[in-house]
């Protein structure tokens, strides 16, 4: 064999080894995007289900739910596949399901909302909390396994509370010894009448909350819920936002220090747009039920109010604002700069993917040091959490040590 032929063979073997070692470009790109955390433009890797610690990943155990909350029973019946379910287009059924979930999994004794206010889906709401718990624990959004559970478990350990979100038990009784470390202080912007984020955050992680809203009726109802649940008392405070044009101003006080802020911003830009969206959801649910061969509604649901009044309803502040989600996020980012040293992490849900780029530009303009985008998925619905901090990594590390 000539020297030229030997050289060609060596080159061929080297190329084959490199080919075997090389990972698909798409996976490499997705992984790098998932870890991007400064001025981060791309999104994280796509997720196809609820968070690994979400108790509702495998659906609902309706027999247990009925046992915990008998008021749910009239709304439960077998679906065409023989599994127990409810009519998710029926607002009374959804409301009864929410109460049962809160009673069974989150040790809430009383929960109710007035007619016309949003009735939130609990699995999706608690998912947001699980992902920001990971954020506080310093876990990348696509981390899975024991390491993630151990680190987030430590958050519960610090606060001497039951860890309600461990997947192996729906109502764990174990309490963790307090290590006399920091307790998580959270701020919920636009809590609504349901107060669902503070309720879940307190019961799943032992966090303490300040919940704000522009609607006095929402604040009144959340206060009523707190008054009827000893588990929430002393852990949830409400503040009324009197200036509808403000987000943080008028809510964050001079001596406040928040580890995390969260928000589910108004989605629509007008009342007509919100109404169209609600009607579209109702029609889609009805079509889906018909396609699956569901039978007519039982007596318990015949007297139900219009579907827009509860599960796809909502007051003005809950569903829409001038400029819609894009403008609300712009206002939030701009105001967050004024409280840069009072909050470790600012976060918000972003429903419309096209609103991310304007947010990135706004965050760069105000000088955010770290920006993260965390994808979430509930069934076919995709959304994401946008998180940003004005503190350097060193300042973030010192945060827990020096804040009161």
UniProtKB/Swiss-Prot annotation:
Biased composition (Basic and acidic residues): 30-54
Subcellular location as annotated: Cytoplasm
GO molecular function, one term: 23S rRNA (adenine(1618)-N(6))-methyltransferase activity
Pfam families, sorted: Methyltransf_10
InterPro entries cross-referenced by the UniProt entry: METTL16/RlmF, rRNA_lsu_MeTfrase_F, SAM-dependent_MTases_sf
Region (Disordered): 1-54, 156-177, 289-308
Sequence ranges of Polar residues compositional bias: 157-172
One biological process term in Gene Ontology: rRNA base methylation
Primary location recorded for the protein, binned into one broad class: cytoplasm
Reactions it catalyzes: adenosine(1618) in 23S rRNA + S-adenosyl-L-methionine = N(6)-methyladenosine(1618) in 23S rRNA + S-adenosyl-L-homocysteine + H(+)
NCBIfam families: PRK11727.1
Function comment: Specifically methylates the adenine in position 1618 of 23S rRNA.
PANTHER family given in the database record: RNA N6-ADENOSINE-METHYLTRANSFERASE METTL16 (PTHR13393:SF0), SAM-DEPENDENT METHYLTRANSFERASE (PTHR13393)
Family: Belongs to the methyltransferase superfamily. METTL16/RlmF family.
Name the UniProt record assigns to this protein: Ribosomal RNA large subunit methyltransferase F
């Amino acid at each position: 064999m000539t020297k030229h032929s030997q050289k060609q063979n060596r080159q061929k073997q080297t190329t084959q080894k490199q080919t075997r070692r090389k990972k698909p470009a798409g996976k490499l790109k997705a992984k790098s995007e998932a870890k991007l955390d400064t001025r981060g433009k791309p999104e994280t890797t796509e997720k196809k289900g609820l968070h690994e610690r979400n108790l509702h990943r495998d659906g609902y155990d309706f027999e247990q739910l009925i046992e915990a909350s008998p008021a749910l029973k009239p709304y439960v019946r077998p679906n065409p596949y023989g599994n127990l379910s409810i009519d998710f287009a029926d607002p009374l059924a959804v409301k009864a399901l929410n109460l049962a979930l809160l009673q069974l999994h989150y040790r809430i004794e009383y929960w109710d909302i007035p007619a016309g206010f949003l009735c939130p889906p609990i699995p999706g709401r608690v998912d947001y909390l699980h992902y920001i718990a990971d954020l506080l624990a310093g876990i990348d959004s696509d981390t899975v396994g024991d390491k993630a559970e151990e680190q987030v478990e430590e958050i519960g350990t610090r606060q001497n509370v039951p860890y309600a979100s461990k997947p192996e038990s729906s109502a764990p009784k174990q309490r963790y010894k307090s290590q006399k470390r920091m307790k998580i202080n959270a701020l919920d912007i636009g809590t609504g009448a349901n107060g669902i984020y503070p309720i879940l955050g307190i019961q799943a992680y032992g966090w303490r909350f300040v919940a704000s809203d522009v609607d006095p009726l929402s604040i009144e109802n959340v206060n009523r819920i707190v008054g009827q649940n000893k588990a929430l008392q002393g852990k949830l405070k409400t503040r009324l936002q009197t200036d509808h044009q403000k987000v943080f101003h008028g809510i964050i006080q001079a001596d406040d220090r928040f580890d995390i802020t969260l928000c589910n911003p108004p989605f629509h830009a007008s009342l007509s747009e919100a109404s169209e969206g609600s009607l579209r959801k109702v029609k889609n649910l009805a079509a889906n039920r018909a396609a699956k061969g569901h039978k007519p509604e039982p007596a318990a649901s015949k007297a139900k109010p219009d579907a827009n009044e509860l599960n796809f309803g909502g007051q003005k502040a809950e569903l829409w604002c001038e400029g819609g989600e894009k403008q609300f996020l712009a206002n939030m980012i701009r105001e967050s700069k004024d409280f840069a040293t009072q909050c470790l992490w600012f976060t918000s849900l972003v429903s419309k993917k096209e609103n991310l780029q304007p947010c990135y530009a706004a965050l760069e303009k105000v000088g955010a040091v770290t920006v993260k985008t965390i994808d979430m998925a509930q069934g076919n619905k995709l959304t994401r959490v946008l998180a940003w901090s004005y503190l350097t990594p060193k300042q973030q590390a010192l945060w827990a040590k020096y804040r009161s």
